[in-house]
Every structure is written in C-alpha cells, then in structure tokens.
Amino acid sequence: MPLLDSFTVDHTRMEAPAVRVAKTMNTPHGDAITVFDLRFCVPNKEVMPERGIHTLEHLFAGFMRNHLNGNGVEIIDISPMGCRTGFYMSLIGTPDEQRVADAWKAAMEDVLKVQDQNQIPELNVYQCGTYQMHSLQEAQDIARSILERDVRINSNEELALPKEKLQELHI
C-alpha cells in the first residue's frame, strides 16, 4: 500500500493548534489545490469529543468559507480527521498558512457567537447522518480552547520522519 503524505510526519512533535500544508498539487488544467492539516489537538494526548467535533464540522465549514474564500481561494471541503485531533481542508488556491490561521481564529469567534443548537446548519434527519449526535457546548469549548492557545504553524521540514525511521516502522 502506498504511504500517504500524512503518515510521513512525526506526530510526536506536532504542535496544536496549528496549520500545516499537508499537500499541494495541480489539476490537469493547472489549478493549484492545497490540502491543509488544521490540527486542533496534540496527537496522542488530546482528542475532540465526538459530539463537539460533529457540531464543529457543521459550523466550521461555513464560517471558514466566510473568512477565507476570495482572492484566488475557494474551499472545496473541510472534513474531520478520523483520529479526532483536527480537520483536513482542501481548497483551490495557495493561501499562506498565516492567512489560514487568521481565518480559522475568526471562524472560532463565530462559533462562540452561536446562541442556540437550532442555529446549527443542516441539523435535521434529512441532511445529517447522525443528527442527534451534536453538542453546541462542546463545539464552543473547542473553539474557546483554540482562541486561548492561539494558532501556530507546523512545518513539514521540521516534522518529517527520517527515512531510517520509516524503514524501522516497516513502511
């Protein structure tokens, strides 16, 4: 099985919250696509609660678009990581990490302004696969934690696993 880019970085040295360019590529027509690792939690030490990350998924996607789309950038998708330590964001364009970090913080401020669970987008049986598994309070706790800790930038060069380590891990 081919080694995915996300498994070539040392998760024991990752900071959180932090932005990292996980991958860049170009379409056959020359459009740049960038995938960002938006790391909310320190891997193997913290995890977002399932109800909170699910609610955040519904809120974060719209709020990030409000703050990041434009000037050559259009978000394709924002999805939670299976490990519940962050989100992957795929977009058209190549914004720098600081622009993404600023949009992320603004989106977290927006999450804190949501006053009622009824304001969560697509929170119904028709548009959500687990519509009863939500917690606005947990989502706001996550947002508050991001803002209190601030958002840093993780560097692929600093986090790269040495080839020897990858061989040792039989990858």
Curated annotation (Swiss-Prot):
Highest taxon in the source lineage: Bacteria
A Pfam family that the UniProt record links to this protein: LuxS
Keywords: Autoinducer synthesis, Iron, Lyase, Metal-binding, Quorum sensing
GO biological process, one term: quorum sensing
UniProt-listed InterPro entries: LuxS_sf (IPR037005), Metalloenz_LuxS/M16 (IPR011249), S-ribosylhomocysteinase (IPR003815)
Binding site for Fe cation: H54, H58, C128
Catalyzed reactions: S-(5-deoxy-D-ribos-5-yl)-L-homocysteine = (S)-4,5-dihydroxypentane-2,3-dione + L-homocysteine
Names of required cofactors: Fe cation
Classification via NCBIfam families: PRK02260.1-2
Subunit structure: Homodimer.
Family classification: Belongs to the LuxS family.
Known function: Involved in the synthesis of autoinducer 2 (AI-2) which is secreted by bacteria and is used to communicate both the cell density and the metabolic potential of the environment. The regulation of gene expression in response to changes in cell density is called quorum sensing. Catalyzes the transformation of S-ribosylhomocysteine (RHC) to homocysteine (HC) and 4,5-dihydroxy-2,3-pentadione (DPD).
Remarks, miscellaneous: E.coli strain DH5-alpha does not make AI-2; it has a frameshift mutation in the luxS gene that disrupts the protein coding region.
Protein name: S-ribosylhomocysteine lyase
Species annotation: Escherichia coli (strain K12)
